[in-house]
Each structure stands twice: as C-alpha cells, then as structure tokens.
C-alpha cells in the first residue's frame, strides 16, 4: 500500500506542482526590496551610526571633558585632552579624537556622557577610500553634530521615555 501511494505521488508530480505554485505565488507578490541609492529604508531612533559632538543652542560645545566616554570605551577608540579650567570653573576639550577603525559602535560612550555631548547619529553612509579618513578629530565631530543636529535631537526626544 505504501508503494502504491509513493507511485501515485511520483506519477502525479505532487512535489513539483506544489513547488511550482509556491514559486508563482512569490513571483507575483509585491517586491520587498528598495532601490537603495535613491530610496532609503526607515532607521530606528536608536540607530548607532556615525559619531557626532553636539553643541548647546548658544553655540558652545557640550563636552565638559569629564573623560567618561574615554574610560568606558571597550575598544579604546576615544582619546581626549582637556584644556585648563576656565574662569567659570568649567573645562572644555583641546583634543577629542575617535578612531572609527577601532570603534565597535556599542553606544557606551553615548550612554556614559552626562551632558549628551557625544552621540551616534543617524548617518550610515560614511564609507571612505583611506583609513586616515576614519580618524575623526574634534572639528570633524562638531561638523557632524551641526549637520545632523535636527535628527539627533528628534531621536533623543523620541527615546527619552525609555532612558
């Protein structure tokens, strides 16, 4: 009896017909791909992309040179040199470098920062041709912050209830 069922299946090509209809159903289903350079998919507010240093609304940089991000970085990709204390008792950085080749995009630096100075922004398109371009200095980080400030502020505001 089992051999009869086996012969009937092979004679009627049950597996072939089932696979054919499955293929046809997928062929006519709506496409799930994007035309990437021209269309970009949605990015989560918690997305960890290119690093940026933020400024206060008055234009002053937020980083207070506490060096918590440098201490917590597991890849040791951040280097900070603090300047002398100012008249009001605060400090600012003289040098703030991130080696993006070493960075593992864990987000610990962003979590450790008490003033939300260092953030990982929404930009994921920062490929370079040389390794030297992946060594970000303070000017490059501040420029990233200025360029992406609106999106960064929106993402931080959306994520605020969960912090």
UniProtKB/Swiss-Prot annotation:
It holds the Pfam family Fer4_7. GO terms for molecular function: 4 iron, 4 sulfur cluster binding; iron ion binding; NADH:ubiquinone reductase (non-electrogenic) activity; quinone binding. It catalyses: a quinone + NADH + 5 H(+)(in) = a quinol + NAD(+) + 4 H(+)(out). PROSITE patterns: 4FE4S_FER_1, 4FE4S_FER_2. Keywords: 4Fe-4S, Cell inner membrane, Cell membrane, Iron, Iron-sulfur, Membrane, Metal-binding, NAD, Quinone, Repeat, Translocase, Ubiquinone. Coiled coil: none annotated. Its cofactor is [4Fe-4S] cluster. It is found in: Cell inner membrane. [4Fe-4S] cluster 2 binds at residues 73, 103, 106, 109. It is a peripheral membrane protein. One of its GO terms (biological process) is aerobic respiration. Belongs to the complex I 23 kDa subunit family. This is NADH-quinone oxidoreductase subunit I. It comes from Brucella anthropi (strain ATCC 49188 / DSM 6882 / CCUG 24695 / JCM 21032 / LMG 3331 / NBRC 15819 / NCTC 12168 / Alc 37) (Ochrobactrum anthropi). The lineage of its organism: Bacteria, Pseudomonadati, Pseudomonadota, Alphaproteobacteria, Hyphomicrobiales.
